C-alpha cells in the first residue's frame, strides 16, 4: 500500500469518526461525501433511500425519472430510433449521438455493439425492440414509458436526457439508489438536485402505505462512506 493511499485512508478515518451515530443535514452530508472521496476519477454522488414499500403490490412499485435542475455531470450517449425521418432529424438536432430507423436499429441490435448509454424510441418501434428484450433488458438499455424513453416526442426526451435526468426504481426491499451528480459539482447544485429527487419520491407515496414512508436516507460517493440524513416525512 502506497504512502499516499495510507494518508488518504487516515484522513477518511478522521473525518468519519462516530459517523454511524450522526445525522446530517443534506448539505452537510454532501460536503462530507465530497471530502471523503479520494478516488482518482470524478466520483458520483449517490442517494440511497429506504422506503416503506411492499413491492409485491402493483401500486407500490415505484419507477420513473426526473429532470435535475443542474444536470448529472455525466456525458450520456443517446440512441434515438424511429421510422419517421422527421423524428430522427429533430432528435439529431436535440443532441442524439446516434439516430436509427428500423433497418439501422436491427443491424445495431444484431451486432450487440452498443455504443450508447440510453435508448429513446417512439412507440411504433417497440415490436422490433421486443425481439431483443433478453439482450437489452439485462444491460438496462430497454426503453420504458415510465422513464420517458418510449414517447411520441423523441426529440424532447433526448433534450431532457442530455440536460440531466435521475432514474429511480425501488428494488424488492423498497430501496432506491440514484445518482444526483458528480463530486466536481458545487454543493449548492447537488443539494438542489437532491431536493428535486427526494421531493419527487415523497409525492409518489402510494395511498396504501401505512406508517412512516421514508425510513432511511443516506448520501455517499463511489467507493466512499455513507452519511445519514435527517428525513422530513
From Swiss-Prot:
Pfam family, one: Ribosomal_L1
Signal peptide positions on this chain: none
Keyword vocabulary terms for this entry: Repressor, Ribonucleoprotein, Ribosomal protein, RNA-binding, rRNA-binding, Translation regulation, tRNA-binding
InterPro entries: Ribosom_uL1_bac-type, Ribosomal_uL1, Ribosomal_uL1-like, Ribosomal_uL1/biogenesis, Ribosomal_uL1_3-a/b-sand, Ribosomal_uL1_CS
One Gene Ontology cellular component annotation held by this UniProt entry: large ribosomal subunit
GO biological process assignments: regulation of translation; translation
An MF annotation (GO) of this entry: structural constituent of ribosome
Family per similarity comment: Belongs to the universal ribosomal protein uL1 family.
Function as written in the Swiss-Prot or TrEMBL entry: Binds directly to 23S rRNA. The L1 stalk is quite mobile in the ribosome, and is involved in E site tRNA release. Protein L1 is also a translational repressor protein, it controls the translation of the L11 operon by binding to its mRNA.
Subunit structure of this chain's protein: Part of the 50S ribosomal subunit.
Record-given protein name: Large ribosomal subunit protein uL1
Protein's organism: Mycoplasma mobile (strain ATCC 43663 / 163K / NCTC 11711) (Mesomycoplasma mobile)
Gene field: rplA
